[in-house]
Amino acid sequence: MAETNRAVIKLREKFSASVLDVKEFRGEVTVTVKREDIVEICNFLKSSLAYNLCTDVTAVDYLGKQEPRFMVVYNLYSIPNKDRLRVKAGVPEAGCSIDTVSCVWSAANWLEREVYDLMGVVFNNHPDLRRILMTDDWVGHPLRKDYPLQGPGREPYKGRLS
């Protein structure tokens, strides 16, 4: 199904060097692309293929399992075509950044702020990249796998747990 998906065919035609992987699982297609081309690819998906809704932006931390360490995931929906597409782009730990797609979908603005706040991925050229959930003085990014379980500077609980 993934290889016959219209979006996949068009992406491979226009961005053959940027499409790194295509997978299909339970009817949902995921396309992994180069992070350097994320804005151009997203512009194409919105303007040419009618993926007019960015429903979510999130990130996965693959600490110790694969490189690049982070994967930024964009969940897209085409209202006229009633079709979903997941786009992923790898982000290395060193220089942990990717260009913002808030210029493509305004809804991505706060979603990218959440990813920045909780995972520490910087979105280049974002109009207002600052914490959205944690306080401004919070140290670190609590959804990273190397973040201390009890929080920064706290001793592990020594009492009974059950």
Curated annotation (Swiss-Prot):
It catalyses: a quinone + NADH + 5 H(+)(in) = a quinol + NAD(+) + 4 H(+)(out). Coiled coil: none annotated. GO terms for molecular function: NADH dehydrogenase (ubiquinone) activity; NADH:ubiquinone reductase (non-electrogenic) activity; quinone binding. Its EC number is 7.1.1.-. GO terms for cellular component: plasma membrane. It is found in: Cell inner membrane. It is a peripheral membrane protein. InterPro entries: NADH_DH_suC, NADH_quin_OxRdtase_su_C/D-like, NADH_UbQ_OxRdtase_30kDa_su, NADH_UbQ_OxRdtase_CS. PROSITE patterns: COMPLEX1_30K. It is an enzyme of class 7 (translocase). NDH-1 is composed of 14 different subunits. Subunits NuoB, C, D, E, F, and G constitute the peripheral sector of the complex. NDH-1 shuttles electrons from NADH, via FMN and iron-sulfur (Fe-S) centers, to quinones in the respiratory chain. The immediate electron acceptor for the enzyme in this species is believed to be ubiquinone. Couples the redox reaction to proton translocation (for every two electrons transferred, four hydrogen ions are translocated across the cytoplasmic membrane), and thus conserves the redox energy in a proton gradient. This is NADH-quinone oxidoreductase subunit C. It comes from Geobacter metallireducens (strain ATCC 53774 / DSM 7210 / GS-15).
